[in-house]
């Protein structure tokens, strides 16, 4: 019984040691799509524009409190706080501090999730994300 307790305690400590750090957020901080609007019908090629309130938009690289950059997730959920945002064809990184992007999507219904993350791409979580739906014609 003592061995089981000890093993459980050690495993718990190990999990705590590798849990991702959750970046701190200023009160009232948020991101938003300025274009397109939720539910909009768009052409296969369109421009998405993003904004951030309560934090400063900066290039990726240095991790500084109150700063970060945008990521756009196509047809996927927001990245949990503290986790690194993936980088692939559906997880677009805007590490140069961009606040808009030209997108080309196939016809149909798509979700776009804007996700803000720190200079090392660690997600600020759901508070710093917004998901909209677009109908591509």
PLM regions and their residue ranges:
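Positively charged n-region of N-terminal signal peptides that target proteins for export
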Residues: 1-4
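Bacterial N-terminal signal peptides
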Residues: 7-14
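Short, compositionally biased P/S/T/A/G/V-rich stretches that sit at domain boundaries
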Residues: 21-43
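Long, low-complexity serine/threonine/glycine- and acidic-rich segments characteristic of extracellular
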Residues: 24, 39, 45-53, 57, ...
């Amino acid at each position: 019984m003592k061995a089981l307790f000890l093993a459980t305690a050690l495993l718990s400590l190990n999990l705590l040691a590798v849990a991702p750090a959750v970046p701190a957020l200023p009160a009232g901080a948020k991101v938003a799509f300025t274009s397109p609007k939720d539910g909009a019908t768009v052409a296969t090629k369109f421009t998405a524009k993003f904004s951030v309130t309560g934090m400063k938009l900066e290039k990726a690289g240095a991790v500084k409190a109150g700063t970060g950059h945008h990521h756009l997730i196509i047809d996927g959920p927001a990245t949990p706080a503290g986790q690194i945002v993936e980088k692939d064809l559906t997880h677009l990184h805007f590490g140069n501090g961009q606040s808009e992007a030209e997108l080309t999507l196939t016809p149909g219904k798509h979700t776009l999730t804007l996700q803000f993350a720190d200079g090392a791409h660690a997600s600020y979580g759901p508070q710093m994300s917004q998901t909209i739906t677009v109908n591509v014609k």
